[in-house]
Amino acid sequence: KDEESKTTLVKADVINLAMFEPRKFNVYESADEDVFYINQLVYSSLFKLDKNLNISPDVVSEYSVDTSSGEVNITLKDNVKFSDGSKLDSSDVKASVERIIAAESGSPYFIYASKINRIRINDSRSFTVVFDSASDASLDNLTFPITSAGEYKKGENFAIGSGPYAYAGHESGKTLTLAANKYYYGGVAKLPIVFNIVKDKSVIPGLMTMDVVTAYLNKTVDADAIAQDKKLKYKKIASGELEYLGFNHENKYCSNSKFRIAIAKAIDSNKIIKYNYADAGVTSDSIYYPNFLGAKKMAHLTTNRKKQLSY
């Protein structure tokens, strides 16, 4: 190309995202979806989900599960700090559980913390989580955000956390800014994040073409078509949302295993994924995402119309 048409690439110094103005930013009380995702950036948790939706340690260095007594013994990593430089310790975990329970069903994390009977602290880095029921002694019940025991105030919107980012500023109706947590144990993030607050998310693809927004999450069935139309790069990611078929065994028809098999064989999951979800889905032989907990193989139930009619 000649000099006049030469393209110059400019390195971005900020990540621009988009969000709705939430009703509240409080980590334990907000039910806004955007705030839930922001929580993953601002706060650490004992355990987190990886790209295959498997449970992996976050601020935990060692753990053991006693399923007979319903207890999980945990030792924290030694280098985890909140964004104010203070160390995360056992008392912070205990206080976080108490705050979630105090928020009751208004908290999206209450379903996890409500199963915990108590936190038995051994020292600043080790403690035991005692569950009400032994069957609840599961690591996926320990995926809630951790806040500082001393700094948090009930109902506050921008509590400090120990995640890769920290709240840095909020202009209502306009922007929310996150700065890198310079104490983050996993390494300091290179770029700050600015959330541009919008009233209609349908305008976001257009904002991306103008470089106002760097990236966004699209959960609609035509997400890939929108990306292709706007010439945007996109990547499919795993989701915990699912659809499943359930049977009431008390029903006189559904109590018959042959009847249940006939219905199951009549459903073509691949066609549902293709025509209802524009291929933005996967099949699984359980209610969990494929490869969850190391499951490598799937037991496919082949759709067979003729055999279905024979039951």
Residue ranges and their predicted role:
Residues 85-86, 201-213, 228-229, 257:
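Short helices/loops that flank or line small-molecule/ion binding pockets
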Residues 64, 109-152, 171:
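Surface-exposed binding/hinge segments that line
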Residues 83, 130-146, 159-201, 223-241:
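Aromatic-rich, solvent-exposed beta-strand/loop patch
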